[in-house]
């Protein structure tokens, strides 16, 4: 009936898993522990998912092959609400000069690998500056 993924619940209290209402899907509970976000997500800039993992995705999750665990590298049904890119992105920027600054700022990858909101194809000098 209600969500088992709030701050006062745990996966154990849900019998090892839970079902959330269709109108509410907690992005921190919609993926296996191996795919938790470990880098900043846009808008909220939450660095790490701390709530219990109590609902696996219905469809297979596409983890980031670069181990960046970007918030958009999973099916649309499992994307955080702040994500705008909804496709799994291959690690085609692995040999370029720098890492993405954030989920929506993959500044150092070929144009063919950039999500729609990004237009920059070269790295900026300062790592603290947004790229896209």
Curated annotation (Swiss-Prot):
An annotated GO cellular component: cytosol
Spans through the membrane: none
Keywords from the UniProt entry: Keratin
Pfam families, sorted: Keratin_B2
Role: The keratin products of mammalian epidermal derivatives such as wool and hair consist of microfibrils embedded in a rigid matrix of other proteins. The matrix proteins include the high-sulfur and high-tyrosine keratins, having molecular weights of 6-20 kDa, whereas the microfibrils contain the larger, low-sulfur keratins (40-56 kDa).
Name listed for the protein in its UniProt record: Keratin, high-sulfur matrix protein, IIIA3
Protein source organism: Capra hircus
């Amino acid at each position: 009936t209600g969500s088992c993924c709030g701050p006062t619940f745990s996966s154990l209290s849900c019998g090892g898993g839970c079902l959330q209402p269709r109108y509410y899907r907690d992005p921190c509970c919609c993926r296996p522990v191996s795919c938790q976000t470990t880098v900043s997500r846009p808008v909220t800039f939450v660095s790490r998912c701390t709530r219990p993992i109590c609902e696996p995705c219905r469809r297979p999750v596409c983890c980031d092959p670069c181990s960046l665990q970007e918030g958009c590298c999973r099916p649309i049904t499992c994307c955080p609400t702040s994500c705008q890119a909804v496709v799994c992105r291959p690690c085609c920027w692995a040999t370029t000069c720098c890492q993405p600054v954030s989920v929506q700022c993959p500044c150092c990858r070929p144009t063919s690998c950039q999500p729609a909101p990004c237009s920059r194809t070269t790295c900026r000098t300062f790592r603290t500056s947004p790229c896209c």
